[in-house]
UniProtKB/Swiss-Prot annotation:
GO process terms (BP): methylglyoxal catabolic process to D-lactate via S-lactoyl-glutathione
Pfam families reported in the protein's UniProt record: HAGH_C, Lactamase_B
Protein name per UniProt: Hydroxyacylglutathione hydrolase
Organism of this sequence: Aliivibrio fischeri (strain ATCC 700601 / ES114) (Vibrio fischeri)
Gene that encodes it: gloB
Presence of keyword Ribosomal protein: no
Keyword Transport in annotation: no
Length: 252
């Protein structure tokens, strides 16, 4: 089993550092090199690879400096995104070997056209595609693409740990409760999250099991969710429900 450390960056980003028992590590979406280098130095890690989910600067800004410090590092990322530092472009269905574990690449377009996620060792590194209690904005892709991407991730085992790239859980839960104000699990979980954040603690990782209970974008088949957007849709297909939810969240 691999271990994962969170490296906070900027206002609410998480850079994920995956390591094994012999001090080798991989980092995911290093938007800033400085905290990564500090963590590597503190723990005497050796950086083997960088995994990138998409091309936004807060996910790749630290890559050039990390490559300068570790010239032999492998830079793995989406083949259909403008990321000049890649050494190993990957796409949906490809595999990446990390510490003798096979991580599969999932194409999850929506937030960006080429966005990917990485799943292995019961851990999902999903960038800005899936958040705890939310999902990424549609900067490049379509609502249907994002809906299908979320369904692809939701089909993974319930015990899968979800490592998203931002601490948005509290604000996402406020929206989730606007959608489902009578969801008792949501109400209880919000209290837990507010307590964690008040003490400066992270709410990530989540699990897919939890997300299926709290995330409105994964609950488009639920009667209460459908009812909440009934006035905003012409038909009640799950894609239409998702589209209405995403539009509502953009304005929330």
């Amino acid at each position: 089993m691999l271990s994962v450390k969170s490296i906070p960056a900027f206002n609410d980003n998480y850079i994920w550092l995956i390591h094994n028992n012999d001090n080798h590590c991989v980092v995911v979406d290093p938007g800033d090199a400085t905290p990564v280098l500090e963590c590597i130095k503190e723990h005497d890690f050796i950086l083997d690879a960088i995994l990138i989910t998409h091309h936004h600067h807060d996910h790749i800004g630290g890559v050039p400096e990390l490559v300068r410090q570790f010239p032999n590092v492998n830079v793995v990322g989406p083949e259909n995104e403008p990321i000049p530092t890649l050494t190993h472009p990957v796409g949906d269905g490809d595999f990446v070997e990390l510490f003798d574990e096979q991580f599969m690449v999932l194409g999850v377009p929506g937030h960006t056209n080429g966005h990917v996620a990485y799943i292995g060792d019961e851990k999902l590194f999903c960038g800005d595609a899936l958040f705890s209690a939310g999902c990424g904005r549609l900067f490049e892709g379509t609502a249907e693409q994002m809906f299908n991407s979320l369904q692809k991730m939701a089909a993974l085992p319930d015990e899968t740990e979800v490592y998203c790239a931002h601490e948005y859980t509290a604000s996402n839960l406020a929206f989730a409760l606007a959608v489902e104000p009578d969801n008792d699990y949501l109400l209880r979980y919000r209290e837990k999250v507010l307590h964690l954040r008040a003490h400066g603690k992270s709410t990530i990782p989540s699990t897919l099991q939890r997300e299926k209970l709290i995330n409105p974008f994964l609950r488009t088949s639920e009667a209460n969710v459908k009812k909440s957007v009934a006035s905003k849709v012409q038909d009640s297909t799950e894609v239409e429900i998702f589209t209405a939810l995403r539009r509502w969240k953009d304005e929330f």
